[in-house]
Structures are given as C-alpha cells and as structure tokens.
Amino acid sequence: MGTITVVINEGPILLIRALHRATTNKKMFRSTVWRRFASTGEIAKAKLDEFLIYHKTDAKLKPFIYRPKNAQILLTKDIRDPKTREPLQPRPPVKPLSKQTLNDFIYSVEPNSTELLDWFKEWTGTSIRKRAIWTYISPIHVQKMLTASFFKIGKYAHMVGLLYGIEHKFLKAQNPSVFDIEHFFNTNIMCALHRNRLKDYKDAEIAQRKLQVAWKKVLNRKNNTGLANILVATLGRQIGFTPELTGLQPVDISLPDIPNSSSGAELKDLLSKYEGIYLIARTLLDIDQHNAQYLELQEFIRQYQNALSESSDPYDTHLKALGLLETPPPQESTEKEEK
C-alpha cells in the first residue's frame, strides 16, 4: 500500500512538473521565435516598455517581481499590485538600456503614425522623481525625434508642442541638457527653413515670434559649433527680416572631424552622432547659396560623405521621405507657443 500510495500521490506531482516544463519550454520557444522574427524597432520598443515598467514599479515590490529566486513566492502567494489589485507576475531582470535602443525605435516608426508621439507622451507622463526615466533622454534623442517627425513620420508640430510643454519637467528632473542649442534649437531652425520653403512662408512677424519662442526654451546655451548663428542669419534672409536674439553671441564655426582611420562600429557611431550636423550643413547650402562662403561646411560634408562610402546619403533620404508623406508638414498655427 505504501508503494501504491507514493505512486498515486506522485502522479499528479510528476504531471504538474511535466506541464510546468512543457509550459516553460513553450514560452521559451515562443520567445526564441519572437526574437528571431521581430524587427529591430519592435525589439527596441519592447526594451523601452520594460524599462519604463520597471522604473514605474513600486520599489518595495521590485524584489518580488524581478528577482528570479522570489518568483515562486509570487506564484504561491496572492501578492497583488496595491494600485491595480492585479496579481503580480514574475518578470525577467531588467538590463541596462543603451541609448541606441531609442534611436532604433525612432527609425522604425512608420509615416503618418502617432506611435512616437504617443510613446513620448507616456514616457514623459511619469513623475519627475523617476530620474532614470527622465535622464535617459539625451540631446541626440531629441534631435532625432524632431528630425524624424518632420521629414519622415509627420506630427512635427505636435512633437514641438509637446517638447515646449514639458521643458520645465526636464529642468526639475535635472536633465536640462536636452534643450540645448546644438541639437534642440538648431534642429528646430533647420526644420523651419525647410518648412518655409515648402509652404512659401514670408511673414516676418510670425517668423520672429517663432524664433523667440524656440530660443526661450533653450536651457543649455553653449554654442559650440557656431551653426546657430548661421541658421538664424539664413532664416532672416529667407523671410526678409533681421533676427534679434538676446544672448546668442557671435561664434566662429567649428565642426568636428571624422578621422579617416575610423572604421567598423566606431565609424557607425560617429555617423549617427554627427548625422544632425550633416543634415544642418546640407540644409544651409541647399537653402541659401550665400552659405557657400563657409568652407567649414563644405569640408565637413566632404568628410561625412567619404565616411558614408556606398551607404545612402541621409540628407537625400530625408528629403525623399518628406516628399512621400501623405500630408504636408503641419501648419504653424498648431504649434504650442509660450511667450
């Protein structure tokens, strides 16, 4: 009887173990298949979502949710989220999130989609006390979001308006660097130059007001490259007015070098890092031939194009994408202005 009892009692136990192994293997199989076929953008979005969930999770609950050794506690005890009252489920440990992850997601968003805008609203809708969320965003991220929104995705005015409205949050979260001259302001003016040409805008009063609003939002006014001065002067010639910006000091143009010795991953990183400067330099020469006097622009363009080798030219690609947008660049009136 003892042997039979053991066999009978172990039967369900062995069955449960087998089912657990099968379920685990099935989940692993699904995960492997998903990783194999998911796009770079989908993988990046999943990592961003997991990072956000982790940092929004109550600190007292993280040890139970994210430590594998505590997973069984969640499975055997009725531990619930104090806010949603939903049963807590174990989650894999969160790995450090690279800056490239957000770049990959930005590049993946389809034209005329609100996906990037919706994601950024959710990300910046968190408490400023969640510093890791706010400090993850870099000036280059802001530049790429603005550039992608204008040339490829659309919803540019909405993205600008969102940024204008949350500037104070980044300041309180101790990440004012995202509102700088080199990435935020210069990209804003670059897009304005293209927008004015496309829409044939010539209203000097509106242009001056828009310029002042953009300048007011700049928290880091280190004018390292001197591109801001050329951009503002080009805007003035394009519209026909004399721009006035208090605090924008004259600076000699100084652009980075792309060494010939760079190759592989290092070269790829440099091309991504300086893509914004390249777009601005090409824009300045494309919009106004007066800027051909700046030999530094031409030299930087030469170096960048040499480094591209046979890769597609990002400026040409961006202009082509802009032409393919189903809707024209947003009207000025939809931008959120703060005086």
Swiss-Prot record:
Tree of life domain: Eukaryota
Gene Ontology terms for molecular function: structural constituent of ribosome
What keywords are annotated for this sequence in UniProt? Mitochondrion, Ribonucleoprotein, Ribosomal protein, Transit peptide
Coiled coil region boundaries: none
What's any one GO cellular component for it? mitochondrial small ribosomal subunit
Q: What is its main location?
A: mitochondrion
What is its subcellular localisation? Mitochondrion
Q: Where is the transit peptide?
A: 1-37
Q: Name one GO biological process term.
A: mitochondrial translation
Q: Extra notes?
A: Present with 16000 molecules/cell in log phase SD medium.
Q: What does this protein do?
A: Component of the mitochondrial ribosome (mitoribosome), a dedicated translation machinery responsible for the synthesis of mitochondrial genome-encoded proteins, including at least some of the essential transmembrane subunits of the mitochondrial respiratory chain. The mitoribosomes are attached to the mitochondrial inner membrane and translation products are cotranslationally integrated into the membrane.
Complex formation: Component of the mitochondrial small ribosomal subunit (mt-SSU). Mature yeast 74S mitochondrial ribosomes consist of a small (37S) and a large (54S) subunit. The 37S small subunit contains a 15S ribosomal RNA (15S mt-rRNA) and 34 different proteins. The 54S large subunit contains a 21S rRNA (21S mt-rRNA) and 46 different proteins.
Tell me its family: Belongs to the mitochondrion-specific ribosomal protein mS27 family.
Q: What is the protein name given in its UniProt record?
A: Small ribosomal subunit protein mS27
Instruction: Provide the species name.
Output: Saccharomyces cerevisiae (strain ATCC 204508 / S288c) (Baker's yeast)
